[in-house]
Amino acid sequence: MAAVALELALASVLFAVTVTDLDRRVIPNAILLAGAVVGIAIVAPTDPDSMPERAAAAAGAGGFLLLGAVFRREGMGMGDVKLAALMGLYLGRAVAPALAVAFAAGSLAGLGLVLRHGAQARTWTVPFGPFLAAGGIVGLFAGDELFDWYVDTFIA
C-alpha cells in the first residue's frame, strides 16, 4: 500500500511540474516542497531503512544537476536541480537511470529541433522539467531493473 501511495505521489508531482514548466517555464517550490513532505511522510514510517539510500540519491542527483546549473547557467534552472533531488528521494538508486533517460530524451528533442529549424533553434530555450518527469516515470517503473542491468553489464 505504501509503495502505491509513493508512486502516486511522485506521478502527481511529475505531472504538475510538467504542466507548469511547459506553461510558465518555472518549477514552483511549493510543488517540490509538498512532494518532499509527502514522500518523507510515506517512506519514513514504512521503510525507514531506505532513508539513507534515498538521502544519498537525492544529494547525488541534485548535486549532479547543480554542476550543470553552475557551469552552464542558461541551460538549467534551480527548479530542475531541486526536482532531480526530489526524484532521488522517491526513487533511490533508480534515479540514475531516470536522469539518463531525461538527458537522452532532452538531447534527442534538441537535436530534432535543430534538424527541423536549423541554427535558429539553438537560441531557443526548452524546459527540462518535462524530460526529468519522463525520466522519473521510467525510473518509477523500470529504474531498479535498468540499474541492475547496467551494473551487471558494465561493472560486474
Spans of features found by a protein language model:
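Transmembrane alpha-helical segments of multi-pass small-molecule transport proteins
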Residues: 6-12
